[in-house]
Protein backbone atom coordinates (compact mmCIF):
# COMPACT_ATOMS: atom_id res chain seq x y z
CA UNK A 1 0.00 0.00 0.00
CA UNK A 2 1.21 3.54 -0.73
CA UNK A 3 2.41 5.48 2.31
CA UNK A 4 0.31 8.36 3.61
CA UNK A 5 1.12 11.80 2.20
CA UNK A 6 -0.83 15.04 2.15
CA UNK A 7 -0.92 16.90 -1.18
CA UNK A 8 -4.04 18.88 -0.39
CA UNK A 9 -4.55 21.73 -2.90
CA UNK A 10 -1.34 20.87 -4.78
CA UNK A 11 -1.54 20.62 -8.56
CA UNK A 12 0.67 17.86 -9.96
CA UNK A 13 1.30 17.13 -13.65
CA UNK A 14 1.95 13.46 -14.48
CA UNK A 15 2.94 12.31 -17.97
CA UNK A 16 2.42 8.79 -19.25
CA UNK A 17 -0.62 8.79 -17.00
CA UNK A 18 -3.03 6.44 -18.73
CA UNK A 19 -1.66 3.08 -17.60
CA UNK A 20 0.84 1.24 -15.43
CA UNK A 21 3.01 3.23 -13.05
CA UNK A 22 1.72 6.59 -14.27
CA UNK A 23 -1.90 5.66 -13.64
CA UNK A 24 -1.14 4.48 -10.10
CA UNK A 25 0.84 7.66 -9.37
CA UNK A 26 -2.19 9.69 -10.46
CA UNK A 27 -4.60 7.70 -8.30
CA UNK A 28 -2.34 7.87 -5.23
CA UNK A 29 -1.85 11.61 -5.61
CA UNK A 30 -5.58 12.20 -6.05
CA UNK A 31 -6.34 10.14 -2.94
CA UNK A 32 -3.77 12.26 -1.08
CA UNK A 33 -5.67 15.43 -1.95
CA UNK A 34 -3.86 16.61 -5.08
CA UNK A 35 -5.41 18.07 -8.19
CA UNK A 36 -3.80 15.80 -10.79
CA UNK A 37 -3.26 16.83 -14.39
CA UNK A 38 -2.90 13.56 -16.30
CA UNK A 39 -1.06 13.76 -19.63
CA UNK A 40 -1.13 10.81 -22.06
CA UNK A 41 -1.89 9.82 -25.64
CA UNK A 42 -4.70 7.35 -24.91
CA UNK A 43 -7.89 9.38 -24.47
CA UNK A 44 -10.09 6.40 -23.59
CA UNK A 45 -7.76 5.32 -20.80
CA UNK A 46 -7.56 8.87 -19.48
CA UNK A 47 -11.35 9.18 -19.34
CA UNK A 48 -11.51 5.86 -17.50
CA UNK A 49 -8.96 7.21 -15.02
CA UNK A 50 -11.09 10.31 -14.46
CA UNK A 51 -14.11 8.12 -13.65
CA UNK A 52 -12.11 6.34 -10.93
CA UNK A 53 -11.71 9.61 -9.02
CA UNK A 54 -15.22 11.05 -9.21
CA UNK A 55 -15.79 10.38 -5.50
CA UNK A 56 -12.70 12.35 -4.44
CA UNK A 57 -12.40 16.06 -3.68
CA UNK A 58 -10.78 16.68 -7.04
CA UNK A 59 -11.28 14.72 -10.23
CA UNK A 60 -8.31 14.21 -12.49
CA UNK A 61 -7.89 16.67 -15.37
CA UNK A 62 -6.96 14.83 -18.59
CA UNK A 63 -4.65 16.19 -21.28
CA UNK A 64 -4.46 14.18 -24.49
CA UNK A 65 -1.04 14.66 -26.03
CA UNK A 66 2.34 13.21 -26.93
CA UNK A 67 5.41 14.23 -24.90
CA UNK A 68 7.48 14.06 -28.08
CA UNK A 69 5.51 16.96 -29.58
CA UNK A 70 7.30 20.20 -30.35
CA UNK A 71 7.71 22.97 -27.80
CA UNK A 72 4.85 25.07 -29.18
CA UNK A 73 2.36 22.20 -28.89
CA UNK A 74 3.49 21.32 -25.37
CA UNK A 75 3.16 24.98 -24.35
CA UNK A 76 -0.44 25.12 -25.59
CA UNK A 77 -1.36 21.88 -23.83
CA UNK A 78 0.29 22.48 -20.46
CA UNK A 79 0.48 26.21 -19.70
CA UNK A 80 -3.33 26.71 -19.41
CA UNK A 81 -3.22 24.39 -16.38
CA UNK A 82 -0.77 26.51 -14.38
CA UNK A 83 -0.10 26.98 -11.52
CA UNK A 84 1.54 23.59 -11.05
CA UNK A 85 3.34 22.59 -7.85
CA UNK A 86 4.94 19.33 -9.00
CA UNK A 87 5.83 17.34 -12.10
CA UNK A 88 6.31 13.62 -12.66
CA UNK A 89 8.00 12.92 -16.00
CA UNK A 90 6.81 9.33 -16.25
CA UNK A 91 6.21 8.86 -19.99
CA UNK A 92 8.79 6.64 -21.61
CA UNK A 93 9.34 3.93 -24.16
CA UNK A 94 11.69 0.96 -24.21
CA UNK A 95 13.44 -0.41 -27.27
CA UNK A 96 15.04 -3.83 -27.42
CA UNK A 97 17.50 -4.20 -30.30
CA UNK A 98 20.95 -5.75 -30.50
CA UNK A 99 23.82 -3.84 -32.05
CA UNK A 100 23.48 -4.32 -35.80
CA UNK A 101 19.68 -4.09 -35.59
CA UNK A 102 19.30 -0.54 -34.23
CA UNK A 103 17.58 1.91 -36.57
CA UNK A 104 17.82 5.68 -36.74
CA UNK A 105 14.05 5.82 -36.29
CA UNK A 106 14.33 3.87 -33.04
CA UNK A 107 17.03 6.20 -31.73
CA UNK A 108 15.14 9.35 -32.67
CA UNK A 109 11.82 8.17 -31.22
CA UNK A 110 13.34 6.89 -27.98
CA UNK A 111 15.29 10.06 -27.30
CA UNK A 112 12.32 12.26 -28.28
CA UNK A 113 10.12 10.56 -25.66
CA UNK A 114 12.66 9.72 -22.95
CA UNK A 115 14.88 12.82 -23.06
CA UNK A 116 13.67 15.71 -25.20
CA UNK A 117 10.09 15.62 -23.91
CA UNK A 118 11.07 15.58 -20.23
CA UNK A 119 13.49 18.48 -20.78
CA UNK A 120 10.92 20.65 -22.56
CA UNK A 121 8.15 19.87 -20.07
CA UNK A 122 10.45 20.40 -17.07
CA UNK A 123 11.50 23.73 -18.55
CA UNK A 124 7.89 24.88 -18.89
CA UNK A 125 7.04 23.78 -15.36
CA UNK A 126 10.21 25.29 -13.89
CA UNK A 127 9.34 28.67 -15.42
CA UNK A 128 5.96 28.37 -13.70
CA UNK A 129 7.72 27.62 -10.39
CA UNK A 130 10.04 30.61 -10.72
CA UNK A 131 7.39 33.08 -11.90
CA UNK A 132 5.09 32.15 -9.00
CA UNK A 133 7.84 31.57 -6.41
CA UNK A 134 6.66 27.99 -5.94
CA UNK A 135 8.95 25.60 -4.07
CA UNK A 136 8.31 22.93 -6.64
CA UNK A 137 9.46 19.37 -7.14
CA UNK A 138 10.21 17.46 -10.34
CA UNK A 139 10.54 13.68 -10.38
CA UNK A 140 11.85 11.93 -13.49
CA UNK A 141 11.08 8.23 -13.87
CA UNK A 142 14.34 6.74 -15.03
CA UNK A 143 15.53 3.13 -14.80
CA UNK A 144 18.13 0.76 -13.46
CA UNK A 145 19.22 0.74 -17.12
CA UNK A 146 20.66 4.23 -16.59
CA UNK A 147 23.11 2.79 -14.07
CA UNK A 148 23.94 -0.71 -15.33
CA UNK A 149 23.96 -2.03 -18.92
CA UNK A 150 21.29 -4.41 -20.17
CA UNK A 151 21.79 -6.68 -23.17
CA UNK A 152 20.09 -5.48 -26.37
CA UNK A 153 19.04 -2.20 -24.74
CA UNK A 154 21.76 0.20 -25.93
CA UNK A 155 19.36 2.93 -27.04
CA UNK A 156 17.13 2.62 -23.97
CA UNK A 157 20.08 2.56 -21.56
CA UNK A 158 21.61 5.60 -23.23
CA UNK A 159 18.33 7.53 -23.08
CA UNK A 160 17.81 6.83 -19.39
CA UNK A 161 21.43 7.69 -18.56
CA UNK A 162 20.85 10.98 -20.37
CA UNK A 163 17.70 11.55 -18.32
CA UNK A 164 19.64 11.05 -15.08
CA UNK A 165 22.09 13.73 -16.18
CA UNK A 166 19.15 16.01 -16.97
CA UNK A 167 18.03 15.44 -13.38
CA UNK A 168 21.43 16.42 -12.00
CA UNK A 169 21.79 19.48 -14.22
CA UNK A 170 18.31 20.80 -13.44
CA UNK A 171 18.87 20.22 -9.72
CA UNK A 172 22.11 22.17 -9.94
CA UNK A 173 20.53 25.10 -11.81
CA UNK A 174 17.24 25.32 -9.92
CA UNK A 175 18.21 24.53 -6.34
CA UNK A 176 18.93 28.15 -5.44
CA UNK A 177 15.25 28.88 -6.17
CA UNK A 178 14.03 26.11 -3.87
CA UNK A 179 13.13 23.81 -6.75
CA UNK A 180 14.07 20.15 -6.30
CA UNK A 181 14.70 17.65 -9.10
CA UNK A 182 15.22 13.91 -8.56
CA UNK A 183 14.98 10.61 -10.41
CA UNK A 184 13.47 7.27 -9.46
CA UNK A 185 15.28 4.33 -11.06
CA UNK A 186 13.20 1.14 -10.86
CA UNK A 187 13.97 -2.39 -11.90
CA UNK A 188 11.31 -4.35 -13.78
CA UNK A 189 7.95 -3.36 -12.28
CA UNK A 190 5.02 -5.75 -12.01
CA UNK A 191 2.54 -3.85 -14.10
CA UNK A 192 0.47 -5.86 -16.58
CA UNK A 193 3.08 -5.07 -19.22
CA UNK A 194 5.92 -6.01 -16.89
CA UNK A 195 4.37 -9.38 -16.13
CA UNK A 196 3.85 -10.10 -19.81
CA UNK A 197 7.34 -9.01 -20.86
CA UNK A 198 9.09 -10.99 -18.12
CA UNK A 199 6.98 -14.15 -18.06
CA UNK A 200 9.70 -16.25 -19.70
CA UNK A 201 11.43 -18.16 -16.85
CA UNK A 202 14.91 -18.06 -18.40
CA UNK A 203 14.74 -14.33 -19.13
CA UNK A 204 13.41 -13.65 -15.64
CA UNK A 205 16.10 -15.76 -13.96
CA UNK A 206 18.90 -13.99 -15.82
CA UNK A 207 17.76 -10.64 -14.41
CA UNK A 208 16.98 -11.88 -10.89
CA UNK A 209 20.40 -13.51 -10.65
CA UNK A 210 21.87 -9.98 -10.71
CA UNK A 211 19.65 -8.80 -7.84
CA UNK A 212 20.30 -9.41 -4.12
CA UNK A 213 16.55 -9.17 -3.49
CA UNK A 214 15.26 -11.94 -5.72
CA UNK A 215 12.08 -10.40 -7.04
CA UNK A 216 10.87 -7.56 -9.22
CA UNK A 217 9.32 -4.35 -7.89
CA UNK A 218 5.64 -3.90 -7.15
CA UNK A 219 3.97 -0.77 -8.49
CA UNK A 220 3.33 0.61 -4.99
CA UNK A 221 7.05 0.50 -4.23
CA UNK A 222 7.75 2.85 -7.12
CA UNK A 223 4.76 5.06 -6.32
CA UNK A 224 5.95 5.44 -2.72
CA UNK A 225 9.37 6.63 -3.91
CA UNK A 226 7.77 9.17 -6.23
CA UNK A 227 5.41 10.54 -3.58
CA UNK A 228 8.27 10.84 -1.10
CA UNK A 229 10.36 12.89 -3.52
CA UNK A 230 7.40 15.10 -4.42
CA UNK A 231 6.60 15.72 -0.77
CA UNK A 232 8.07 18.09 1.81
CA UNK A 233 9.51 15.01 3.53
CA UNK A 234 12.24 15.18 0.87
CA UNK A 235 12.83 18.92 1.29
CA UNK A 236 16.62 18.47 1.51
CA UNK A 237 16.86 15.96 -1.35
CA UNK A 238 17.75 17.09 -4.86
CA UNK A 239 19.89 15.76 -7.68
CA UNK A 240 19.44 12.20 -6.46
CA UNK A 241 18.86 9.04 -8.49
CA UNK A 242 16.89 6.72 -6.23
CA UNK A 243 17.16 3.03 -7.18
CA UNK A 244 14.09 0.89 -6.53
CA UNK A 245 15.81 -2.15 -7.92
CA UNK A 246 16.43 -4.77 -5.24
CA UNK A 247 20.14 -4.01 -5.29
CA UNK A 248 20.62 -4.53 -9.04
CA UNK A 249 22.63 -1.33 -9.45
CA UNK A 250 24.90 -2.34 -6.56
CA UNK A 251 26.32 -5.26 -8.55
Swiss-Prot record:
Keywords from the named record: Carbohydrate metabolism, Cell membrane, Membrane, NADP, Oxidoreductase, Xylose metabolism
Catalytic activity line of the entry: xylitol + NADP(+) = L-xylulose + NADPH + H(+)
GO cellular component, one term: plasma membrane
GO molecular function, one term: L-xylulose reductase (NADPH) activity
GO biological process: D-xylose metabolic process; glucose metabolic process; xylulose catabolic process; xylulose metabolic process
Tissue: Expressed in intestine, gonad and spermatids (at protein level). Expressed in intestine, uterine seam, gonadal sheath cells, spermathecal-uterus valve and spermatids.
InterPro entries registered for this protein in UniProt: L-xylulose/Carbonyl_redctase (IPR051737), NAD(P)-bd_dom_sf (IPR036291), Sc_DH/Rdtase_CS (IPR020904), SDR_fam (IPR002347)
Xref: Pfam families: adh_short_C2 (PF13561)
Activity modulation notes: Strongly inhibited by 10% dimethyl sulfoxide.
Protein family according to the UniProt entry: Belongs to the short-chain dehydrogenases/reductases (SDR) family.
Matches recorded under PANTHER family: D-ERYTHRULOSE REDUCTASE, D-ERYTHRULOSE REDUCTASE-RELATED
Function (record text): Catalyzes the NADPH-dependent reduction of L-xylulose, D-xylulose, L-(+) erythrulose, D-erythrose, D-threose, L-ribulose, 1,4-dibromo-2,3-butanedione and 2,3-heptanedione. Also active against isatin, 9,10-phenanthrenequinone, menadione, 2,3-hexaenadione and 3,4-hexahenadione. No activity observed when tested using NADH rather than NADPH.
Name of the featured protein: L-xylulose reductase
Species name: Caenorhabditis elegans
Source lineage: Eukaryota, Metazoa, Ecdysozoa, Nematoda, Chromadorea
